[in-house]
Amino acid sequence: MNELESLKKKIIYRSAYRGTKEMDLLLTSFVSSIINTLSHIELRKLDIFLNCNDEDISNFYLNKIPITTFDDAKILNLLSCHKIK
């Protein structure tokens, strides 16, 4: 397994096992919709994003409250536009 595949597997796993079912559903859906469209650098940023706590991610997604610990505009824009199917 190469580094890119390993990183993708890590991201998929971390998006699916967050701590709350709501975050599991949101982030699993979000990650699966974008993971194959991101560059290696963007995947690293997504991995960093997944270090943010669930409350910050939820507040950003639902209320558009900025996440002070993460500032990548592309990832945040993709999340804000994401709709769970």
Q: Where are these predicted regions, by residue range?
A:
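Positively charged, polar, low-complexity stretches
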Residues: N2-L43, D47-K85
